[in-house]
Amino acid sequence: YFDPFSLDVWDPFQA
């Protein structure tokens, strides 16, 4: 997934 509030890819396991 991609987090529009971040410049990184959002990790869903990071919670």
From Swiss-Prot:
Induction context: By water stress.
UniProt subcellular location: Cytoplasm
Keyword Cytoplasm on entry: yes
Keyword Hydrolase part of the UniProt annotation: no
Gene Ontology CC annotations of this record: cytoplasm
Keywords: Cytoplasm, Stress response
Main location: cytoplasm
UniProt subunit comment: Forms oligomeric structures.
Family of this protein: Belongs to the small heat shock protein (HSP20) family.
Misc remark: On the 2D-gel the determined pI of this protein (spot N144) is: 6.1, its MW is: 17 kDa.
Protein name as catalogued: Probable class I heat shock protein
Organism taxonomic ancestry: Eukaryota, Viridiplantae, Streptophyta, Embryophyta, Tracheophyta
